[in-house]
């Protein structure tokens, strides 16, 4: 509860008459005065900011006459105006039937003492104090400090003490007569725990919201209006409604006729026809039927889907390393093919005189460099021209034949045979070395005859 006021009091000040107790059926009760929270600040426009007989005189002057009373509520922190009629005929004591005390309402809610645990057979239990819901708000004397209550209890040892107690459960104040006794058999003179401070103040508006709540049990003859969201119509029991035909159920059943999930789905249609429009629940037998559904082709029953083949045959293990014509192999490089050169035939190994035959494996053939297309016009004669001059060569025909034979074999291994190769070799050899014309020609002819 806040201790500061939110409105300005007419005439200024923070003083008034604190309403402590309101008797039943009294003029103050009919005016709506609320104990502990209400402060009478003025009557008929007269500000009550002093502790004198002004309030009594105004009430006596207006007996059986309605007067206007301005009330400040520390619960709502607002001012309100009410009408009260002082009377001696209502059947109780006083003209208003209320107990009041002049004090300041600024900080009045801070001086409260919260009743905590209450021991059995203690003076507090015998006086009717209720644990955790009772708040001691005052006594016959003014208490402004926390020690004022304990001092008052010590001075009333074994003597009756009147306390004003507010209860949050009943939202009302009452007078409690308690007799402090330190020899009651327990701790303390009251036998109860008392809290003081910020954490033990009276909660703000404890029952204002709760009073507006009306339970359905209090209105036995009033039928409960169903909600418009449809949730009140959902029945959680297994008993079906007597006869309900919601319009949305028929459309759902018609739209589901074209959807063939299994051969006979009777369980689904029975659930949709129960009449429950919002929460259709599937019974357990649906799951049993779904477990026995044979494999089917969804393209035959569901429209708008791409048709799938009826079944896939058992495929053997495929060799994933087979290169497709449109897929470049991921590992390795493709073979370099020169479009201007025909493929080279495999040559048999040469048996040279005096040298052991050297086998030429086929796996070493791709390691030889290929002659580019620009040098394809070069003949074997150019390769022979790089040999040493024939003037320095020995005159032995067999040696000349062997060299020519070796040169001819080198030329055949590197460059493909062409039609112009023999003529070019004969012309170049004839121009440079006329002495070895016949042996070279014979060697070339021999090679040509030996080639496959």
Swiss-Prot record:
Changing residue 449 to D: Phosphomimetic mutant. No disruption of homodimerization. Residues 15-105, 111-199 form the PDZ GRASP-type domain. It is a lipid-anchor. Myristoylated. Myristoylation is essential for the Golgi targeting. Residues 15-215 are annotated as: GRASP. A lipid is attached at residue 2 (N-myristoyl glycine). Its main location: Golgi. Pfam families: GRASP55_65. This is Golgi reassembly-stacking protein 2. It comes from Homo sapiens. The lineage of its organism: Eukaryota, Metazoa, Chordata, Craniata, Vertebrata.
């Amino acid at each position: 509860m806040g201790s500061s006021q939110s409105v300005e009091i007419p005439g200024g000040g923070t003083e008034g008459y604190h309403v402590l107790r309101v008797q039943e059926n009294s003029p103050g009760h009919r005016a709506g005065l609320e104990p502990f929270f209400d402060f009478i600040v003025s009557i008929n426009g007269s500000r009550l900011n002093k502790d004198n007989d002004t309030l009594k005189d105004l009430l006596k002057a207006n007996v059986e006459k309605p007067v206007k009373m301005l009330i400040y509520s520390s619960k709502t922190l607002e001012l309100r105006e009410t009408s009260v009629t002082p009377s001696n005929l209502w059947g109780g004591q006083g003209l208003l039937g209320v107990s009041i005390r002049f004090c300041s309402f600024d900080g009045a809610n801070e001086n409260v003492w919260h009743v905590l645990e209450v021991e059995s057979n203690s003076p507090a239990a015998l006086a009717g104090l209720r644990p955790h819901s009772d708040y001691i708000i005052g006594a016959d004397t003014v208490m402004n400090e926390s020690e004022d209550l304990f001092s008052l209890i010590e001075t009333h040892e074994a003597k009756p003490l009147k306390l004003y107690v507010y209860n949050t459960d009943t939202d009302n104040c009452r007078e409690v007569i308690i007799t402090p006794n330190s020899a009651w058999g327990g701790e303390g003179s009251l036998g109860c725990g008392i809290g003081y401070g910020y954490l033990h103040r009276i909660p703000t508006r404890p029952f204002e919201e709760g009073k507006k709540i009306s339970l359905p049990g209090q209105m036995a003859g009033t039928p409960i209006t169903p909600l418009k969201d449809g949730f009140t119509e959902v029945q959680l029991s297994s008993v079906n409604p007597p006869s309900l035909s919601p319009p949305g159920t028929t459309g759902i059943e018609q739209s589901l006729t074209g959807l063939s999930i299994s051969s006979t789905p009777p369980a689904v249609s029975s659930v949709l026809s129960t009449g429950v429009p919002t929460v259709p629940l599937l019974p357990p037998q649906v799951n049993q039927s779904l477990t026995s559904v044979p494999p089917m082709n969804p393209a035959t029953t569901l429209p708008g889907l791409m048709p799938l083949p009826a079944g896939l045959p058992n495929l053997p293990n495929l060799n994933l390393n087979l290169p497709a014509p449109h897929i470049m192999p991921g590992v390795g490089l493709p073979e370099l093919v020169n479009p201007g050169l025909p493929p080279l035939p495999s040559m048999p190994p040469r048996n040279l005189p005096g040298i052991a035959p050297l086998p030429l494996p086929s796996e070493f053939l791709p390691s030889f460099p290929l002659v580019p297309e620009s040098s394809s016009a070069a003949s074997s004669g150019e390769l022979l021209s790089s040999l040493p001059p024939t003037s320095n060569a020995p005159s032995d025909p067999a040696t000349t034949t062997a060299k020519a034979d070796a040169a001819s074999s080198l030329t055949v291994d590197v460059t493909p045979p062409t039609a112009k190769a023999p003529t070019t070799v004969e012309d170049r050899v004839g121009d440079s070395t006329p002495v070895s014309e016949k042996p070279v020609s014979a060697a070339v002819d021999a090679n040509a005859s030996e080639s496959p």
